[in-house]
Amino acid sequence: MVSWGRFICLVVVTMATLSLARPSFSLVEDTTLEPEEPPTKYQISQPEVYVAAPGESLEVRCLLKDAAVISWTKDGVHLGPNNRTVLIGEYLQIKGATPRDSGLYACTASRTVDSETWYFMVNVTDAISSGDDEDDTDGAEDFVSENSNNKRAPYWTNTEKMEKRLHAVPAANTVKFRCPAGGNPMPTMRWLKNGKEFKQEHRIGGYKVRNQHWSLIMESVVPSDKGNYTCVVENEYGSINHTYHLDVVERSPHRPILQAGLPANASTVVGGDVEFVCKVYSDAQPHIQWIKHVEKNGSKYGPDGLPYLKVLKAAGVNTTDKEIEVLYIRNVTFEDAGEYTCLAGNSIGISFHSAWLTVLPAPGREKEITASPDYLEIAIYCIGVFLIACMVVTVILCRMKNTTKKPDFSSQPAVHKLTKRIPLRRQVTVSAESSSSMNSNTPLVRITTRLSSTADTPMLAGVSEYELPEDPKWEFPRDKLTLGKPLGEGCFGQVVMAEAVGIDKDKPKEAVTVAVKMLKDDATEKDLSDLVSEMEMMKMIGKHKNIINLLGACTQDGPLYVIVEYASKGNLREYLRARRPPGMEYSYDINRVPEEQMTFKDLVSCTYQLARGMEYLASQKCIHRDLAARNVLVTENNVMKIADFGLARDINNIDYYKKTTNGRLPVKWMAPEALFDRVYTHQSDVWSFGVLMWEIFTLGGSPYPGIPVEELFKLLKEGHRMDKPANCTNELYMMMRDCWHAVPSQRPTFKQLVEDLDRILTLTTNEEYLDLSQPLEQYSPSYPDTRSSCSSGDDSVFSPDPMPYEPCLPQYPHINGSVKT
């Protein structure tokens, strides 16, 4: 007998009603059995296929003629009647079909002379495919076939997939809405956003509509994708609709979180194997390193007080997170004993956990040591007695010293003062030929700590106890400063709006709106040092029209207030986005009409002002290191002012830079030499200025849209650059390209940029309004930097010599020119 399990090819068409596929051919085979039994005639043909949905009734008819007795089998097992199976003549009925009823059925007709068998294939399956768009390759479809004579209005075929109406997803995720439906004739589907027709040009990157799956797919969602999405399914007999609500949540910036208790302490014998496991949870892509604490010249710490470290394992281009989270140590020796640290960092900060490895002697060596237990016990007792004696002597000496030098608190004032020097970092120029920024830990300010002698408070109870030296040139009376509403939180504390009476010396009785930086309630000594350092930096830099200027400070008789200029129109990125025309990509509200109409000259003027501000900072030997539209503020008179240039950043420990408050990764604004070599110069600021120009002429667009960070490193190394914005002239775009030259020395200076922009601004008239209704061009890495010879994988810009290792902080690995952040 032929084995049907090997030669039956089934084509199953999903249907709502029972359908029958007729055989296309038949083959008759006579088989001679034992002489005493009548010959059996098998009707071996392609089985008839019956398809039914779960719960439906199934009826199969045996088409054999002249059948005296008909018997039924399923998968070779005799089939008898029961509460769901009914056998009536040549008919087999199955009530309430289930997937278990699927299989190969056969009916055999027994006659006096011979017998004949007929086969059927039954398939009980859902009419609706369960495949998502991720499984499109399986060919499953959500279409439902209808009897051509049964006309029907649209209806939902799988409401379970539509129950979740509210979708809240993090930014950059993919969102899919589904509306599985049926009807006759087959209905059509269209999508609305906020009640209006949803078109491809309404979002950057467009969207996908999978009609065979009744789905809408949006990749890399952004906050502007928030809203109500309605699917409308209709044919000539009716229309139905269903609405989803999408909420895009900005990612919460947080340094990596390490699972408690991991890595765990471990012990093994010499020659054994051991592994440490470190579980890292991070929203932003983390960079993970395994570090071992080592000794040099018998010491675990260097002259600077930092421990000696050795990097054992770091993430590379082809390393997965699961691989880097496990550290294997094979064939352990005594030298492997010690402290091991799992260090993880992202753009927000770093976290680390440590564990100890104890190495025990091998069983053979242990016997040698235990051969003379008397000597070992004697040594232990001697050491113990010696330590106890030392402790007793130390306690006696301390008590004698305290007794002879105990101060008389009753004769002293209630408050004492202790002068504490806090080292403040500032930028200096190494030489006339180099504009790289270095560190100087020279104490700039002496800060006096107030100590209470009548309470058992710790010596440094809080930064609110500190007294700063008064600077008459900048000191401003507290009683003339009225604090207002909060404006936000910065690197060192919070910023509030305030009214300062008489801060403008030309108008001593007039109140001026200012911004005040202050520490938070839980601020640390380092936060105070950072804020004082920023204030001192702003004092040294001086004033300019296109930077945020220091107006004064309140340092006496209260918390530290740093008073700076107030910019009423917020940061430049949001300022530009708010002035986009309706319908433009990234537009948060397509129905909103912008308050002001931007002209081409406005954008050139904005760029020119920022170039002047950076030219001034460069002349003052100040390197910004985070130049971007988010760090530019706009005043009421549309004057551009560069902010955050006075932050005291430690450039030697810049591996993990703080993420900005709006969640953007600074690496997209960083020059290659800053990204890979940690070299920050005025030329690296010029690179960032080119990205800032791109932001301006795209009215607040996000650089390298849709490009992952790892892919960005590769593209920059190969010489790719962003395309020209749709509303930017070739001359301005070539200026951007010059700023993005791979060789820092080939980039223009800020002085040259000011001269070029001044010329362009002079030739530009106010009548040159921008046609911003056209969509912005998509970024495509198809424009390599053909003018630069520094795009090869072996170029020194992207494959630098390793820099001296710095303890406690992860290093960027130069593996194939890629860095994991």
From Swiss-Prot:
PANTHER family for the chain: FIBROBLAST GROWTH FACTOR RECEPTOR 2 (PTHR24416:SF130), TYROSINE-PROTEIN KINASE RECEPTOR (PTHR24416)
Name recorded for this polypeptide: Fibroblast growth factor receptor 2
Heparin-binding: annotated span: 161-178
Active site: 626 (proton acceptor)
Modified residue annotations for Phosphotyrosine: 466, 586, 588, 656-657, 769
Native organism: Homo sapiens (Human)
Signal sequence region: 1-21
Domain of life of the native organism: Eukaryota
Chief localization: membrane
Subunit structure: Monomer. Homodimer after ligand binding. Interacts predominantly with FGF1 and FGF2, but can also interact with FGF3, FGF4, FGF6, FGF7, FGF8, FGF9, FGF10, FGF17, FGF18 and FGF22 (in vitro). Ligand specificity is determined by tissue-specific expression of isoforms, and differences in the third Ig-like domain are crucial for ligand specificity. Isoform 1 has high affinity for FGF1 and FGF2, but low affinity for FGF7. Isoform 3 has high affinity for FGF1 and FGF7, and has much higher affinity for FGF7 than isoform 1 (in vitro).
Glycan attachment positions: 83, 123, 228, 241, 265, 297, 318, 331
Entry's EC annotation: 2.7.10.1
Gene name of this polypeptide: FGFR2
InterPro entries recorded: FGF_rcpt_fam (IPR016248), Ig-like_dom (IPR007110), Ig-like_dom_sf (IPR036179), Ig-like_fold (IPR013783), Ig_I-set (IPR013098), Ig_sub (IPR003599), Ig_sub2 (IPR003598), Kinase-like_dom_sf (IPR011009)
Effect recorded for residue 203 to C: In breast cancer samples; infiltrating ductal carcinoma; somatic mutation
MF terms in GO: ATP binding; fibroblast growth factor binding; fibroblast growth factor receptor activity; heparin binding; identical protein binding; protein homodimerization activity; protein tyrosine kinase activity
Residues annotated for ATP binding in this entry: 487-495, 517, 565-567, 571
